[in-house]
Amino acid sequence: AFIEAHRPELARVVLELHLEHAAAEHVARDGAVVPTGQPEARWWFTSRLPRLEAAVRGAVEAEKLERSFVVPPTIFGPQPTTDGGFFHLEGVPLVNFLTAPFYLFDAMDTLDKIHRASLVPVTRAAVRIVESTAGVSAAAMRGEADGQTSVRGAGPLGLRPRKRGGS
């Protein structure tokens, strides 16, 4: 509904940043679900834009967010499986952070499953990523698509080659 109502404004959006989950890793042990003390693997679904990918990698490293993967939004198919997926299909640059614990959306998915030690560094990483866009226009951000851009109706992975030169 939001995209339909605001589609003309999407071209002016420099970055769509989504923070979904900061989950603690839990495993089944002796018939119980117990915490390991580690965060779940962290997924940073990031549009294939060199400037943005570098900003995310830099933020992850600076905040020592181990167990992080910086991956394209289309890694699992043309429709990203994240909250930001619909923005990606509209060509809006995206960073979507999440973890995907086995208990997600289950009755056992309770507040005690938050990896509290991740909250501050993930927040700081998000701030670093947003700060990396200072002075960057939406057009400039999209123009760095490393030969590929994501748009509605694009190729098999939601990608198509960027036009080069006069052709």
What are these regions (language model features)?
Residues 99-167:
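His/Asp/Glu-rich mid-to-C-terminal helical/loop segments that flank catalytic regions of hydrolases
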